[in-house]
Regions:
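Generic N-terminal amphipathic, Lys/Arg-enriched alpha-helix
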Residues: 1-18
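N-terminal glycine-rich anion-binding loops that anchor highly charged ligand groups
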Residues: 2, 26-30, 35-36, 41-49
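Short coil/turn segments at secondary-structure junctions
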Residues: 11-15, 177-181, 213
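Active-site anion-handling motifs in enzyme catalytic cores
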Residues: 23
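Anionic-ligand-binding alpha/beta catalytic cores of soluble enzymes and soluble regulatory domains
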Residues: 212-246
Length: 246
């Protein structure tokens, strides 16, 4: 939303992306409050915003950035000035080397992926995570629901059990089940994670709660979000909590 009376659009080159830094600063103040009062880390999702000209500003109000491809991981390293938290549904022999060169954390979508590439990541000192499917998502359209029956996005608790549990070398769990969602949806997601994966939470170092947190919306209850995250941290004090709002 732009206040047109303050912008002379005739002087703006077209096509272009136009960003109102005042609105961005307002949103970042909300993010800062959540980081400060909840103790959770907030990292920037490049799939939602890859405008590298504002990376210096975003870097001052975040704890890093997340990538979903080799190109995004390279952009984080080169323009954000630090290695990326990387997750992609698929890694290949052709791109895994570049991705690892640009990453500090990498999340694997399956146990098979970790068996294939995990040793390479661990040898480089990269923190490895596993995407899990907590069997809950508020997304109503099956096409976009990552937890729909038959989903290949993440590992279910039953799959972990049949494969002998969480493998050595996995330091984090990652779920991504929200989309423009409220704090009450995150609460239900965390309840599902504790119900299905609670036995592993005190064995790992970090829990990435993915994106879809609409925390800068006027109707979003940030007080509830902060209380929810603090309560979860109190139950699992060893865990680093990570959010990836777009």
């Amino acid at each position: 939303f732009f206040e047109q009376r303050m912008i002379d659009f005739k002087r703006v080159p077209s096509p272009c992306f136009l960003l109102d830094e005042r609105l961005l600063a307002r949103n970042l103040s909300v993010v800062d409050r959540v980081r400060r009062e909840s103790g959770a880390e907030v990292i920037v999702a490049l799939k939602a915003c890859a405008m590298w000209s504002i990376f210096p500003l975003l870097a001052r109000h975040s704890d890093g950035a997340t990538a979903s491809s080799a190109a995004e991981a390279r952009l984080v390293r080169e323009e954000f000035g630090q290695p990326a938290h990387t997750y992609a549904p698929v890694y290949t022999d052709r791109n895994i080397g570049e991705i690892l060169d640009c990453s500090s954390h990498i999340t694997f979508n399956s146990l098979g992926q970790f068996r294939r590439f995990g040793a390479m990541a661990l040898l480089r000192g990269i923190s490895c995570g596993l995407r899990v499917n907590p069997r809950y998502s508020p997304v109503e359209t099956d096409l976009y629901n990552p937890c729909v029956a038959g989903s290949r996005l993440g590992v279910t608790a039953e799959e972990l059990e049949t494969q002998g549990g969480l493998p050595d070398g996995i330091e984090g769990l990652h779920f991504h089940v929200l989309c423009e969602s409220r704090s009450e949806h995150l609460r239900k997601a965390l309840e599902a994670v504790e119900r299905h994966f609670g036995r592993y939470l005190d064995r790992i170092q970090w829990l990435n709660m993915g994106g879809g947190h609409l925390m800068t919306h006027a109707d979003y209850d940030c007080d509830d979000l902060i209380a929810l995250l603090r309560d979860f941290r109190a139950r699992h004090p060893r865990l680093r909590l990570i959010l990836e709002p777009g």
